[in-house]
Regions:
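Cyclophilin-like peptidyl-prolyl cis-trans isomerases
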Residues: 1-143
């Protein structure tokens, strides 16, 4: 993930969330994320992006099923954003928006499909502001 602040390398885990990883790779390879703004930055919580309009309430026009896994949401975890109703996350409402945790978030639980983590460049994510953008998102290796 190339951002206006620097580069971030993430490791995706298809063994945790195969459909979510496939969705993310397809979006990245198509250029869908290129130019997207980091529209939600909450210090010590999350940095969120993945919508070309920069609107956290925007919908992708499709959803993917939630993929529950036992991974704790520690710092640098990548998971899918969800819609909410009555202050509760709606499972199976993920599409294109994702977030990266800026600190451990164990209370987020298993409703959110965790599909990867930051391998290098966490300092870039930790210093993002809401006007920053992803300039290029591509898959660089198969391993």
């Amino acid at each position: 993930i190339r951002t206006t602040r620097g580069d971030v390398v993430v490791r995706l885990y298809p063994e945790w969330a195969p459909s979510t990883v496939a969705n993310f790779i397809a979006l990245a390879q198509s250029g869908y994320f290129d130019g997207n703004r980091w529209f939600r930055i909450v210090p010590n919580f999350v940095a969120q992006t993945g919508d070309p309009t920069g609107d956290p309430d925007s919908e992708a026009g499709y959803t993917i099923p939630a993929e529950e896994n036992p991974v704790e949401q520690r710092s640098g975890i990548i998971a899918m954003g969800l819609d909410y109703k009555d202050n509760k996350p709606l499972r199976d409402s993920a599409g294109t928006q994702f977030y990266i945790t800026l600190s451990p978030q164990p209370y987020l639980g298993r409703d959110f499909s965790v599909f990867g983590e930051v391998e290098s460049g966490f300092d870039v994510i930790a210093n993002l502001i809401e006007s920053d953008r992803m300039t290029l998102v591509r898959r660089i290796a198969d391993d």
